[in-house]
């Protein structure tokens, strides 16, 4: 069994996608469909986590992180399905300074994706859903 290191929590009230979110770490914001919304928050979480994992993989390989300055951009898209349901899709775009000098870039990206906790969550490997009465 995995050892839990810590937990962060956030609570949504009001209109859901057009409501309010308050949580640990100073999160206290209104959500809007065209502004800060769940997709934007997911993209920010994944980009930050993935870039950290990528830099760790680079260091483990002896790659100079400062020289290559990785930039990870997470894109989270909101889809309407043919059956009327909703779905999210996501992809990561990574750029490096001096990329032509890097070896096995795809291997680095794959290692970071395998290590990144948010990537694991997106794959559904570690999602637990519990419904509790109020």
Whereabouts are the PLM-identified features?
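Extended beta-strand/beta-hairpin segments
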Residues: 1-44, 51-134
């Amino acid at each position: 069994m995995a050892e839990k290191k810590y937990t962060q929590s956030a609570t949504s009230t009001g209109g859901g996608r057009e409501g309010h979110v308050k949580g640990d770490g100073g999160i206290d914001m209104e959500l809007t469909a065209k502004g800060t919304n769940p997709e934007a928050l997911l993209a920010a979480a994944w980009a930050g986590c993935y870039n950290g994992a990528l830099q760790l993989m680079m260091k483990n390989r002896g790659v100079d992180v400062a020289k290559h300055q990785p930039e990870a951009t997470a894109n989270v898209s909101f889809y309407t399905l043919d059956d009327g349901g909703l779905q999210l899709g996501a992809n990561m775009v990574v750029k490096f300074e001096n990329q032509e000098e890097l070896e096995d870039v795809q291997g680095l990206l794959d290692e970071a994706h395998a290590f990144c906790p948010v990537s694991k969550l997106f794959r559904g490997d570690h999602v637990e859903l519990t419904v509790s009465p109020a």
